[in-house]
């Protein structure tokens, strides 16, 4: 549980497993390098059953699994012995702060009593604050960045793929005449993600698709998936109200030179966004403990929700593959019927007039099947290019929020409680020194400086803790807007089915009408 108000948050619990334990059921297998493998994503441990269906043979699950593995293992987020895991976030409540610690801004300490705040969660001020954040984010906005794969691969020994990245609208804080097309490679996208994680660790930074899965880095289907994943990544970044304003994001999208060379020469800022910031006391007055409870509940259920949506997306992909097979089989059926009609004349030489009439209608059936195959092909393409992308984008959004929660557990710690205790002890020593004439002045001054330094550190850490709290609330508020992605994707799904179902029905009605004249007897 991500309890921001708990004094024992950082005690080790079952959720903070080491990589070996957390990924015990996510072992690489030879099937990982093929597109026929079991779901072994971090939340879909084994081949999962869904009613009478077993969710196996899914390259999407491999993509999600590798993405999450990169997120947690390669970044070593669960590195044993991380000091922050044993620290508290908010320190002791005000009742435990020594009143003699002058100069400490205790107004930023966690408030034990909420009597001075609004009793109801959705107070008018808090609601206005949230509404102002909601208006900055529209997850249903159209993509404004296009990523296309350049066919020619570069490199002498190790070939790599380049991508043409084009933004379709004028970007914030850029000249309208800025270059709208740049060439980037996967490592450039990776660099952008890493600097965003350094600067904005408590923002919803989307994950990148895996660089490769087994030996699939040269597989055209895998490369197509990776290109789509990169496109989703950069569009989620540019939709984010804070990330889209970042200078390095704009550099990534506008600087026409090789980004690797630019990084070696340029001096760019990667300091955390909270540097030199002070928490607005108006926000502190808005805070309500129930907000922490909501986060904790979301954190407890996010894996379940992610698992369910992955299953949904897998089934959508499976439906797409079935449509491809249906389309091919309809064309095949049309050809087989044509062959039958060509050969049937030899079986009915005495009834040539009738059999020719029948065969002409059979030709109509063949054309109808080809028309249905074209309809199935269009539907499959629409699923692949639009619907499936929307399902996967929502996966990316959920994983981005999960990343915020997980990074909070690792990176938001402080040692306020330890510093408070040390200040109290040193204050007692200082008082005893004042009554002892034998104590040297240098020792007294040194202890007083230590107390003052610890007080400043406590104030700084309290300030940072509140800034983190505000940042995560902003992210959680704008995340609420993504609930409409669920509505949108299912509306689009139903609309698509109605469209192609109507086309299919009309086609069958036409062929049925034509077949009414097909001979049933000699009369």
UniProtKB/Swiss-Prot annotation:
Keywords: Cytoplasm, Membrane, Protein transport, Transport. Its main location: cytoplasm. PROSITE patterns: PX. It is found in: Cytoplasm; Membrane. Residues 17-37 have a biased composition (Polar residues). One of its GO terms (molecular function) is phosphatidylinositol-3-phosphate binding. InterPro entries: AH/BAR_dom_sf, PX_dom, PX_dom_sf, SNX8/Mvp1, SNX8/Mvp1_PX, Snx8_BAR_dom. SMART domains: PX (SM00312). Gene3D superfamilies: Arfaptin homology (AH) domain/BAR domain (1.20.1270.60), Phox-like domain (3.30.1520.10). It is a peripheral membrane protein. The keyword Lyase does not apply. Residues 141-260 form the PX domain. Disulfide bonds: none annotated. The keyword Cytoplasm applies. Residues 1-37 are annotated as: Disordered. One of its GO terms (cellular component) is membrane. One of its GO terms (biological process) is protein targeting to vacuole. Belongs to the sorting nexin family. Required for vacuolar protein sorting. The PX domain binds phosphatidylinositol 3-phosphate which is necessary for peripheral membrane localization. This is Sorting nexin MVP1.
């Amino acid at each position: 549980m991500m309890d921001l108000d708990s004094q024992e948050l950082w005690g080790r619990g079952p959720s903070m497993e080491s990589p070996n334990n957390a990924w015990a059921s996510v072992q690489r297998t030879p099937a990982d390098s093929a597109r026929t493998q079991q779901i072994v994503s971090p939340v879909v441990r084994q081949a999962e059953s869904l009613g009478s269906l077993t969710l196996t043979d899914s390259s999407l699950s491999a993509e999600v699994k590798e993405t999450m593995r990169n997120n947690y293992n390669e970044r070593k987020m669960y590195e044993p012995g991380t000091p922050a895991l044993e620290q508290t976030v908010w320190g002791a409540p005000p009742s435990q702060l020594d009143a003699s610690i002058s100069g400490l801004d205790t107004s930023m300490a966690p408030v034990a009593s909420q009597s001075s705040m609004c009793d109801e969660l959705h107070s008018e001020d808090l609601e206005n604050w949230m509404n102002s954040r909601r208006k900055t984010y529209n997850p249903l906005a159209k993509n404004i960045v296009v990523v296309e794969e350049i066919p020619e691969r570069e490199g002498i020994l190790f070939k790599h793929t380049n991508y043409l990245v084009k933004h379709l609208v004028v970007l914030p804080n850029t000249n309208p005449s800025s270059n709208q097309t740049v060439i980037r490679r996967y490592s450039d996208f990776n660099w952008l993600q890493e600097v965003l994680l350094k600067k904005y660790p408590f923002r919803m930074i989307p994950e990148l698709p895996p660089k490769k899965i087994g030996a699939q880095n040269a597989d055209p289907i895998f490369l197509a998936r990776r290109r789509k994943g990169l496109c989703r990544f950069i569009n989620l970044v540019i939709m984010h109200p804070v990330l889209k304003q970042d200078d390095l994001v704009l550099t990534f999208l506008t600087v026409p030179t090789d980004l690797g060379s630019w990084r070696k020469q340029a001096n760019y800022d990667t300091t955390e966004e909270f540097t030199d910031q002070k928490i607005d006391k108006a926000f502190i007055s808005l805070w309500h403990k129930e907000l922490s409870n909501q986060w904790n509940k979301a954190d407890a259920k996010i894996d379940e929700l992610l698992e369910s949506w992955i299953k949904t997306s897998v089934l959508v992909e499976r439906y797409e593959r079935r449509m491809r097979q249906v389309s091919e089989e309809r064309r095949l059926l049309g050809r087989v019927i044509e062959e039958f009609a060509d050969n049937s004349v030899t079986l009915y030489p005495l009834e040539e007039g009738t059999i020719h009439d029948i065969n002409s209608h059979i030709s109509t059936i063949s054309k109808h099947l080809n028309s249905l195959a074209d309809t199935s092909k269009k539907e499959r393409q629409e699923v692949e290019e639009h619907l499936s992308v929307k399902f996967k984008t929502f996966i990316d959004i959920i994983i981005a929020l999960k990343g915020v929660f997980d990074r909070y557990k690792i990176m938001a710690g402080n040692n306020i409680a330890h510093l408070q205790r040390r200040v109290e002890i040193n204050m007692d020593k200082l008082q005893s020194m004042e009554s002892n004439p034998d104590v040297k002045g240098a020792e007294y001054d040194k202890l007083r400086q230590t107390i003052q330094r610890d007080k400043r550190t406590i104030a700084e850490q309290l300030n940072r803790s509140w800034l983190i709290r505000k940042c995560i609330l902003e992210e959680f508020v704008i995340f609420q807007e993504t609930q409409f992605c669920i509505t949108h994707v299912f509306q689009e799904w139903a609309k698509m089915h109605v469209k192609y179902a109507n086309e299919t029905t009309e086609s069958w009605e036409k062929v049925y009408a034509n077949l009414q004249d097909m001979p049933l007897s000699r009369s």
